[in-house]
Structure formats: structure tokens, C-alpha cells
Amino acid sequence: MPTPSTFVDQTKIEVQAGKGGDGMVAFRHEKFMPNGGPAGGDGGRGGSIIFVADNGLRTLMDFRYRRKFKAEPGENGRIKAQYGKAAKDLYLKVPVGTTVYDFFTGEEIGDLVENGQELVVAKGGRGGRGNIHFATSVNTAPEIAENGEPGEFRTLRLELKVLADVGLVGFPSVGKSTLLSVVTSAKPKIAAYQFTTLKPNLGMVLLPDGRDFSMADLPGLIKGASQGVGLGIQFLRHVERTKVILHMVSMDPNNGRDAYEDYETILHELASYTEDDLSSKREIIVASQMDIPGADEKLAQFKKDLAAHGVDQEVYELSSVTHQGVDRLMSRAADLVSEVEAQEAEAAVKPKEEVKTKTYKYHRPEKMEFTVEKLADHEFEIHGEQLERLVAMTNLDHQDGIMRLARRLKRMGVDDELRAQGAVDGDDVYIGDFSFEFVQ
């Protein structure tokens, strides 16, 4: 397992898919055919950026020092109507359990929960069309081709939620890490002070009857965790993935705490988590540290308080030091994991998709929406995502391309809107990196 200083469960990155290759302006010049017509091929598709879930990874550490990723552009079109070669996609491995969000809107883009699952987070631009596509009866030798479409650019937030069948929850220093070290091969840091566990520790529990399940020792909770106090939201995020909660309450009579109040506080924080009501998960109540003198009396009072508040659950007594109750507790946890898995399988009405690759489709308006901003006297800027892409795909090195763009802008109503904003002949108009003089 990584050390506390290297565990990374949340990060921000930028992804830039590859630009499509430019279409080509070319003509056939074969023997006996000096004016053989257009023969410029299309550009190749730009590389997409694809996340791949890999269960060999445990953290988002790979994204800690490298935050910008760029795929290759497609190859330009060629002569003799030959297409340019498509660029290779850029695959980035992430841990299983990674959720991807748009950094600015907070919208969830995808959730990678299976090994090998893929998610296209930035799609490569399509190749521009060569001049073979623009021949008409009027213009049989078009000097026009499209530039490749820009690849998608996104700023993303990656969030790792540990995938564990069983999660150990409770106040700091109730024995969660000790239990994990006893029942698995995990080696968590253990000490008698708050927040020793600053990251989830994960291990596998193997029972004598052949059953197994994964268990996570999660950072300790305190009052107000659902609002971010202490390790707060960082902790609760990881509880989301668990099937069963082992709710550990210390029976140490010397810690000055009331066992039922601790139990109720943790339950309240689980229920208050804004993403999901975590208190609805299957729970086993565990009375920990039963080897400490005076623990029996505190346990008796805890059971009375539970009954008085209508909590009708068995309390499992545990000492990780003497191993009292460990086997029985692990067997019960395995039973509940199996029950939850059976319920999930029954609830799954749709068959599992064979294709594991998902492409996230970002919203694009059906119409080319745009706005006109007056920057200063005689200066205007036009904004609009699709309009800017149209300009970027226009080959401005050829007069035919410029005239075609002008016609499309006029049909879209750009000229009318500029006039309505007070534009006159000779005013400067900007669209992305492109500028032109307005002519009425």
C-alpha cells in the first residue's frame, strides 16, 4: 500500500484531444489529363483521450505531477484523393473506482467500476474534407478544403472512491486499523491518537470455509464530518462503495466518551452525507477493545441505551488484541456481503453490456447559437462554441474558403446581429483567432 503522503484520491487534470487532419486542395495532373479535376483527400481523425480502469492501481498518484494530456493530431489529406491516417488514441490508466466529473459544472461524466472498463473523455476532431467534396457544376475546380476539426478540450476532476465490500467506520482510535491488521495482510499505521489513518487501507479477508471479501479501514469520523469537519467528506466518499459497514464503538472506560452518543453521532453523519444516505447500508455493530478492564460494564450500559432507543441489533464483542470474537464477526460480515450481492444481482434488470467503452457526449446546441459583444468603438467579438469550430475548420488560405465562410455567417444571421449592435463598414470583428472587417 502507498504511504499516507502518497495516497491521492482527488485531482484536477486537463485533456486535449487531437485535432483532425486538414483536407487537401489538389488536382489530378496525369498524362493527357492536365485539368483532371479535384483530387484532394480528407484528413484523418484526431486521437481521442480514453480512461481505462486498472485494478492494479490504488491511487491517482500518476496524475499528481503530470496534469495536462494531449493526444496526437490526425494526418493531413493527400493527393490522389488519399485519406490522411487517423491518429492513435491516448489511453490513460486510472484505478478501479474512479469517478470523472466536469471540473467547472460538477456534472458526472462517468464512473469506472470494472477492471478494463473504458471511458472516452475527450473525442478527437474529425478530419477536414478535401476539395473532392466541393466540386459543383458551376465550380469544377474548387480551391477549397476544410481544416481538421479541433479536438475536445476538457478540464476534469477525478475522484477515487475505494472499492471495498466491508468498510470499518467509527471514531478515531476505536481499533479499526488493529482489526484490519489482524484479519488481513494489510499493514496500516497504528497509534493511539486521532487521525492515524489519513488514507484508506485495503486488505483481503480469507475465511477457512473458502469465502473472501475486501475490507477497508477508513479514516476516523468526528462530529460534523458530513459538513467537512476533520477528514469529513474525504472519508464519507469512500463509504459510498462499501456493501457492509462494521460500525465500531470503543468500550474503553478510560476514554471519557459515552458509547451510545458515539454510535448515534456516527450514524447521524452517515445519514447527513449529501451524496447518499449512507446509514441505509447493512450494518454490524461492533463493541471493540473488550480486553480493557471495565469494558464489560460499559458494554452493558451501551446495550441498554441501544434498546431504549429502539435499536434491535446484536452487538458483536471484539478484542483485536486477544482475537476474541474475530472469527465470528468475520463470518457474519461474509454472510451480509453475500446477501447484498444477491440483492444487487436480483435488482439488475438489464444484462451486462459486452462493450465496456463509453463515450461521453458533451452538450452541443442543435443550432449554431452565438452572441455578439461590443468590445469598444468599432470592435466586436462573436462568441459561440460551434461557430468558433466552424471558423477553425475553414481554410483561410484560399479565397474560396473565405467566401464560403462569409456565406455561412450571413445565413446564420451574424451580419444582421452585427448591424443591430451598431456595426458599420470597416469595423473589426473577432471570432476566436480569426478577424475580419465588417462590410454591409
Swiss-Prot record:
Q: Indicate which residues the UniProt annotation says bind Mg(2+).
A: S177, T197
According to the UniProt record, one GO cellular component term is:
cytoplasm
Q: Which GO terms describe its molecular function?
A: GTP binding; GTPase activity; magnesium ion binding
Q: Which Pfam families match?
A: DUF1967, GTP1_OBG, MMR_HSR1
SUPFAM superfamilies for this protein: Obg GTP-binding protein C-terminal domain, Obg GTP-binding protein N-terminal domain, P-loop containing nucleoside triphosphate hydrolases
Say which domain of life the source belongs to. Answer: Bacteria
- Name the UniProt record assigns to this protein: GTPase Obg
Q: Which gene encodes it?
A: obg
